[in-house]
Amino acid sequence: MQNLTYKILEKHLLKGKLEAGQPIEIKMDQTLTQDATGTMAYMQFEAMGVKKVKTELSVSYVDHNTLQNGFMNADDHAYLQSVASKYGIYFSKPGNGICHQVHLERFAKPGKTLIGSDSHTPTSSAMGCIAIGAGGLDVAKAMAGIGYRLTCPKVVEVKLTGTLAHGVSSKDIILKLLELLSVKGGVGKVFEYTGEGVKNLSVYQRATITNMGAELGATTSIFPSDEVTREFLKCQQRESDYIALSADEGCHYDETVEINLDELTPLAACPNSPDAIKNVSELAGMKVDQVAIGSCTNSGYEDLMKAAAILKGKKIAHNVSLVVSPGSRQVLMKLIENGTLATFVSCGARILECTCGPCIGMGQSPKSDAVSLRTFNRNFYGRSGTLSAGIYLVSPEVAAASAITGVITDPTTLEYADEFEKEQSYIDDSLIYAPSKDPEHVEIVRGPNIKPLPVNTPMDSTIDKKVVIKLPDNITTDHIAPAGAKVLPYRSNIEKLSTFVFENNKPHFDEVCKENNGGIIVAGENYGQGSSREHAALAPMYLGIKAVLTKSFARIHLANLVNFGLLPLIFIDKSDYDKIDEMDELKIENVNSLYDSLDLIVENVTKNETYKVHAPISQEDIDILMAGGALNYIRNQQ
């Protein structure tokens, strides 16, 4: 008897045993990239010398860098389109939609495996597949036919009972889990949803939950493939992709969490973390300045129809700016077709294109000290583009209700009709381009912003560097390598991007690294949580960072550090963290001894102290680190 997670993993297992905590390697059927991480991923794929992708399906999406206020983003898009055409990859044009929304609608299949260069790739697991977010280099390796290495996860059963009440959303289910478990509560785990309550959730509702499983730090989340899945695929004219998949009755789970949907109330994640949860009723009456409905979490057909039901026939409050961004062109066309877009426009909403937009700080930054309600998945400090703004994560129902009243409002207190026409999808794949049938004659387009890929040098046997920055718990990849309209255009230019590293924590960090010939980073718990962007490892590598010493790491960032040859270490005695100060000189000798033991000694030369540390890596990771990163390792193997 097996749970659903292990059923799919077993069919794709290349190496290892399905035992929690053990290293395994699995075959990936599909890949996806988005443009902010995709340019680097495809440059890495090119460096491997493979003539065509070896996956069943690979798709390149453009949904991040669509604010084209200079040549850089357009150049990147031209590069991505030419690479896709040459190497056997489908290309989704700007405006076609957010990668996760479009992939769920048009490509995700039950029972398959998917790896994507975006941390919210698990959105597609709502379809009953294993979808995992990773760094771009791991995605490039998958396209080259190389298996994906990970630690075999524990499987947590999330047993749902009951039915969501009027005004309560699937967003509230995942916010409840975050309240119970925190942003690091899912590290090393897959969350598998079971119970009678699952049958009452549509695929779009399930996708909201699997999407924000990333905020738990989970490897992925998964729902069964059932009649609800079949109906969704039928609407997408893809019923032939359906297979029934579920866990065996009486199968083993490492943990079980029970949630009664009948008892849930609307929730909000308060600034500046997705697990800072309060009941909306506790926040009711707080003045609101901005409301944003959209993102890969809540921009599906049903979410926007529910928001429109609350807004219909009303006007937004005079103090509120409301923006709405549909998740895909398919959804937008359906809203035009049934008149719902007119509802949004007439109430005073501003309609944005089908992209990530405000969720990644790409426009719509709120005013100073604003309260902004967003149906997004992250509210990290500074992510909106306004450092002083307070960002609250809420459901579309809470967002719409609050836009009308001008204050945070519990939608369960309002009367509105939330029954709407069953979706009959508007299917038009004309903005998804198939790869060329004549790839030999396709020329790669490289604009001046696309700089050569920086490559690390082999690991030294002794690391002797200063601590160039010391950081607290829960540092995100947004802290390390910020996003937003100012920075994202340079994701293909690591030299320029490196000047923004830690700019909100330590301005001119890049200059400190240059003055000290690189250095070591020291941090607290859950270092590198959030986005899968490998630039948070690649840019520090470019600046000469050789090791990162923390209390613990987030899963994807740990893998990215190894991929780029930065030595990850954790304190065996976490209190040693308090003994280290910025600019202390740390020496790590006999790094080659990792082959014999994953434990090392760090000498604090400045304070004449020593600390025991552990490298949370596998034997193959050691080979990669010693080579100076995965690209060097792959080249050495050829």
Segments from the language model and where they lie:
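Fe-S-dependent hydro-lyases/dehydratases of central metabolism
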Residues: 1-638
